[in-house]
Design a protein with these regions (language model features):
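S-adenosyl-L-methionine
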Residues: 1-178
């Protein structure tokens, strides 16, 4: 790494050769956090959201959400969020390109959410995590492949979707195309 940095034409990169064991950019969350892939296939009905502990270093191919709030996990794991990504987010080939700036920061969340409604979303989000734990032998990409998604995970996401949709409307949306 030292030689690589010394061979650069960029003065800041050359300076970093003094500490070859350090990352160029070190912005790590101080608490546990969530991650979302930068690029996801368009075949998925949901974007897989992962939890990382604060001592884990995420790949540059992941978007870091500096929160471990299960309510936020529920919102991000919902079909409503996937529809938002389809409308607002970027595209990459046949899939989605997730951007914290475009997809996460602009996702509309109702201002007034009752305690009961928030608890319901959290409960359903925990149901998604529990359903994922039942299939620990599967990679997350396979869990969210429509052809392989376990029935329990699909059901847990459907229940979460209903809870999230109730935050926005008294009736459930019939057509949620991303």
């Amino acid at each position: 790494m030292k030689e690589f940095r010394l061979s650069s034409k960029s003065k800041p990169t050359i300076k970093l050769a003094e500490t070859p064991d350090r990352f160029h950019v070190e912005t790590f969350p101080s608490t546990d956090y969530m991650v979302i892939q930068e690029v996801s296939t368009g075949r998925r009905e949901y974007v897989p959201v992962g939890y990382f502990s604060r001592d884990m270093i995420s790949s540059n191919l992941l978007n870091v959400i500096d929160s471990s709030d299960p309510f936020v996990f529920g919102l991000l794991s919902s079909r409503m969020h996937m529809v938002w990504i389809g409308a607002i987010g970027g595209r990459f080939r046949d899939g989605f390109r997730y951007s914290c700036t475009l997809s996460y920061n602009t996702f509309p969340v109702p201002k007034s959410i009752s305690y009961a409604a928030k608890r319901d979303v959290i409960e359903k989000a925990m149901g998604v995590l529990s359903a994922r734990e039942e299939s620990l032998n599967m990679f997350i990409g396979d869990l969210y492949d429509p052809a392989q998604m376990p029935r329990q995970l699909k059901k847990a996401h459907s229940l979460l979707d209903m809870s999230v949709e109730r935050l926005y409307s008294k009736s459930i949306f019939l057509h949620n195309e991303a």
